[in-house]
From Swiss-Prot:
UniProt gene name: tmem150a
UniProt cross-references to InterPro entries, sorted A to Z: DRAM/TMEM150_Autophagy_Mod (IPR050911), Frag1/DRAM/Sfk1 (IPR019402)
Gene Ontology cellular component terms for the protein in this record: plasma membrane
Name recorded for this polypeptide: Transmembrane protein 150A
Cytoplasmic side: 1-3, 97-108, 162-182, 227-271
Keyword DNA repair belongs to the record: no
Protein task: Regulates localization of phosphatidylinositol 4-kinase (PI4K) to the plasma membrane.
Organism: Xenopus laevis (African clawed frog)
Chain ranges passing through the membrane: 4-24, 76-96, 109-129, 141-161, 183-203, 206-226
One family name in Pfam for this protein: Frag1
GO annotation, biological process: phosphatidylinositol phosphate biosynthetic process; protein localization to plasma membrane
Positions on the Extracellular side per record topology: 25-75, 130-140, 204-205
Key words of the record: Cell membrane, Glycoprotein, Membrane, Transmembrane, Transmembrane helix
Major subcellular site: membrane
Topology in membrane: Multi-pass membrane protein
Length: 271
């Protein structure tokens, strides 16, 4: 067992409580209404709610979307921090998983596509976390439009790879768990898109609920990599580097003597 097992656990343990803290701060500061509220008004002329308690009058501007919760300070500061740190962890997890699959099996388009999807998901998270929806709506929506589908694609491909690499009953059970999480993510994301284009109060509130389910589901999925990361070693990254070096040496146009000598030198350096 290696220390890398802490990374996926840390992502889940840091991000899930973090976004709930952001939500609680937004509710207490009257920036959004609580998720259990299902009553909305067209306008709120006078809200006599006491400080430190949830709003008593809510409009569509107060729907507790995750992005809305992180729009205004002070919660926006924590929201950006969670987005940036979480994105960095996601990239490291994707790189390690990519290298681990190469070490166990061989290079495949599924593995490469999963790496690209995971890194794209991280890039979208950075945009979502740093461009608040009320101040940079276009950039925020671009980030969300990139992060959510890329995250779904990553979990889909990772679930397939889990079955391809399964060698024990526990591996297959983990694959079943990941497929279940993937199905939940797919359903919640599709419903988010369907409800988002509706203008009714009920539909917009359902958007918030589906969005929360999707994000929490994806974070739990990333946490499941703790199972495989117990076997990550220094040889894991080397396997990816050696595979890349071997591929470049075998590429067309690399048959010259100087290129072959360079490739041989790289192989010797990796030993």
């Amino acid at each position: 067992m290696t220390g890398w097992i802490v990374l996926p656990i840390s992502l889940t343990a840091f991000s899930i409580p973090g976004i709930w803290i952001v939500y609680a701060m937004a509710v207490m500061n009257h920036h959004v209404c609580p998720v259990e509220n299902w009553t909305y008004n067209l306008t709120c002329t006078d809200d006599n709610t006491k400080a430190g308690t949830p709003k008593s009058c809510c409009t569509l501007e107060d729907v507790p979307l995750i992005s809305k919760c992180g729009t205004y300070p002070p919660e926006s500061c924590l929201f950006s921090l969670i987005g940036n740190v979480g994105a960095f962890m996601v990239v490291i997890i994707c790189l390690l998983r990519y290298s681990q699959v190469i070490e166990i099996s061989q290079r495949s388009w599924l593995n490469t596509t999963a790496l690209i999807a995971g890194c794209t998901n991280a890039a979208g998270l950075v945009m979502v976390g740093n461009f608040q929806v009320d101040y940079a709506k276009s950039l925020h929506y671009i980030g969300a439009g990139v992060a959510f589908p890329a995250g779904l694609l990553f979990v889909c491909l990772s679930s397939i790879l889990s079955y391809q690499l399964a060698a024990s009953a526990l591996d297959y059970w983990l694959g079943h768990l990941r497929v279940s999480l993937t199905i939940v993510a797919l359903i919640s994301l599709v419903l988010t898109g369907v409800f988002f284009i509706q203008e009714s109060f009920l539909m917009q509130h359902l958007v918030a609920i589906c969005e929360w389910i999707f994000v929490l589901d994806i974070l739990v999925f990333y946490g499941t990599f703790a199972y495989e990361f117990g076997s990550v070693s220094t040889d894991t990254m080397m396997a990816a580097l050696q595979s890349s070096a071997a591929r470049s040496c075998k590429s067309p146009g690399s048959s010259s003597t100087s290129t072959q000598l360079h490739c041989n030198a790289e192989r010797i350096a990796m030993i």
